Amino acid sequence: RYLSYVPPRTAHAWVMRRNGVAAASGSAERPWLICIHGYQMGMPLVDFGAFRPEWLQKKLGLNLILPVLPLHGPRKIRRVSGDGMLSGDLLDTVHALAQTAWDLRRVVSWVRAQGATRIGVFGLSLGGYSTALLAAFERDLACAIAGIPATDFARLSWRHGPPDSLRVAEELGIGLNETSDLKRVISPLVLEPQIPHERRYIFGGSADQLVPPDQVRD
């Protein structure tokens, strides 16, 4: 069924680099940072606003690319950006996160094709989770920064989900343990990071109520 969704088939990303295009400008020599926003991403103003792009580009001299994850923004399948990624059919979540890993690897390949020699990744919330996934497959990343990463969506669902919906799910035999088992196949916690420890970074909020500290400690 997931393959029948048309919008996620086309990749989208926002790009901000010196002089817009052309390696001749010296843009290719600048390090690139892949910035991955969180749940309900997909609007350039909001996505760029989460990462202080002018500071990253002008102060640090970085080129930026902000990919739009499946089921978000121009790739959404319902009225609201992100619907289906973390709610609804569990298999849609699994397929969307698997596609996320695939898409991000294609983003890395595209950036390399622009002549980039140093590529880092920085994600927030769902983007932090996606950063951890990418770090399990790309050994040549200059850095991977997982910010406020959700690491266990099953636990988060049971923490924030509507009680009536959770009760119905459990009556159908879909409890926390079953959901955790299903989502293990797309969990960065069961994958070995491919980049060295000294190039991996993580941070969270001690009082964050959406992504609580135990998610970051995991």
Over which residues does each language-model region extend?
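Short, surface-exposed "cap/lid" segments of acyl-processing enzymes
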Residues: 3-79
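Secondary-structure boundary elements
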Residues: 17-26, 55-63, 105-120, 138-142
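Structural beta-sheet core signal
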Residues: 35, 121, 146, 201-202
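Conserved alpha/beta-hydrolase "nucleophile elbow" surrounding the catalytic nucleophile
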Residues: 37, 123-125, 205
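Short acidic/His/Gly/Ser-rich catalytic and metal-binding motifs that mark active-site loops
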Residues: 73-84, 154-156
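Alpha/beta-hydrolase active-site loop
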Residues: 78-114
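Primarily recognizes the serine-hydrolase "nucleophile elbow" in alpha/beta-hydrolase
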Residues: 107-161
